[in-house]
């Protein structure tokens, strides 16, 4: 990815102090999405990265991973699979719990998400990699469905949190922007 694109993306992402709670600097990508030419450049750059890798599906983590993942799946001509919070998918699901700062949560994937095909090649995508909990749980769901995650892709990775390192121990990890 070229440095000009990275700089344009960084400048387009709004930072909101103390959201959703005090001490957090929230990275809001809705401002990036308001610029169609820049969003297209982002998706085109990701398409170029994955086009030759024979990807079968893009797996997007709720909610902003849906935006990036759907656009990328369309650009690549492959299927899109959502990973959602527990209780949000209508058919039979597999569930995976993960730890939060205070407690735990669960995410789910449809048990037929890859149409019953074993060994499909997928890219996992989300907007932000922080602690890595949701991404690691998503990898477990992908593995449970006997798919191969080729890479976990994030628009941003927070260097001061352990997510990048934890994920790199399990799967090739790409963060377009390290913040």
Swiss-Prot record:
Annotated keywords: Cytoplasm, Glycosyltransferase, Purine salvage, Transferase
One function term, GO molecular function aspect: adenine phosphoribosyltransferase activity
Gene3D superfamilies recorded: 3.40.50.2020
GO BP annotations listed: adenine salvage; AMP salvage; purine ribonucleoside salvage
Catalytic activity, as annotated: AMP + diphosphate = 5-phospho-alpha-D-ribose 1-diphosphate + adenine
EC number: 2.4.2.7
UniProt xrefs under PANTHER family: ADENINE PHOSPHORIBOSYLTRANSFERASE
NCBIfam families reported in the protein's UniProt record: apt (TIGR01090), PRK02304.1-3 (NF002634), PRK02304.1-5 (NF002636)
Its job: Catalyzes a salvage reaction resulting in the formation of AMP, that is energically less costly than de novo synthesis.
Protein name in the entry: Adenine phosphoribosyltransferase
């Amino acid at each position: 990815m070229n440095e000009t694109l990275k700089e344009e993306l960084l400048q387009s992402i709004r930072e909101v102090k103390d959201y959703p709670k005090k001490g957090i600097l929230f990275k809001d990508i809705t401002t990036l999405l308001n610029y169609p030419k820049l969003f297209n450049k982002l998706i085109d750059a990701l398409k170029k990265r994955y086009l030759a890798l024979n990807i079968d599906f893009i797996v997007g983590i709720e909610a902003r991973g849906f935006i990036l993942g759907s656009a990328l799946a369309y650009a690549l001509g492959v299927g899109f699979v959502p990973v959602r919070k527990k209780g949000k998918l209508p058919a039979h699901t597999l569930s995976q719990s993960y730890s939060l700062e205070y407690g735990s949560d669960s995410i789910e994937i449809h048990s037929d998400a890859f149409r019953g095909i074993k060994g499909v090649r997928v890219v996992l995508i989300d907007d932000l990699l922080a602690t890595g909990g949701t991404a690691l749980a998503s990898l477990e769901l992908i593995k449970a469905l006997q798919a191969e995650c080729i890479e976990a892709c994030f628009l941003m990775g927070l260097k001061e949190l352990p997510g990048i390192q934890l994920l790199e121990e399990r799967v090739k990890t790409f963060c377009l922007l390290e913040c």
